[in-house]
């Protein structure tokens, strides 16, 4: 089974805006000046530009500050074990290829701890 995102599966011609992907929660526990605010803003803009349907979006994260990102995205959410966000996201895609999957993680989560 191919785990590569096929554009026609998740993108449509509906004119989504970044606010369509923003959950009701407002990030308030990242440190002032933290780069995660920029990552969140960039992700919301990219999802809108690509036209990913929020009802067909899954956000997967591991442990750490970056793991909070899915809570601010209007999507299905999965908080996984440290170092397992990538494998879990792959499993989600293999089980539900009709859904778009976004993974967030930090350096420890992605490269050195738990994997």
Can you annotate each of these PLM segments?
Residues 1-30, 36-56, 98:
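Iron-sulfur (Fe-S) cluster-binding modules
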Residues 56-62:
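A short beta-strand-loop structural module common to alpha/beta enzyme folds
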Residues 31-35, 77-80:
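Catalytic cores of large soluble enzymes that bind and process phosphate-bearing ligands
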Residues 63-115:
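Thiamine diphosphate
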């Amino acid at each position: 089974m191919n785990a590569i995102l096929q554009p026609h599966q998740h993108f449509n011609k509906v004119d989504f805006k970044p606010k369509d992907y923003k959950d009701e929660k407002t990030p308030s526990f990242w440190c002032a000046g933290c780069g995660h605010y920029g990552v969140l803003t960039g992700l919301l803009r990219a999802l809108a530009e690509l036209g990913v349907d929020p009802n067909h979006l899954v956000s997967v994260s591991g442990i750490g500050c970056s793991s909070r990102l899915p809570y601010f995205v209007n999507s299905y959410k999965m908080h996984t074990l440290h170092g397992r966000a990538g494998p879990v996201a792959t499993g989600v895609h293999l089980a539900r290829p009709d859904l778009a999957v976004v993974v967030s993680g930090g350096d420890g989560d992605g490269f050195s701890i738990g994997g």
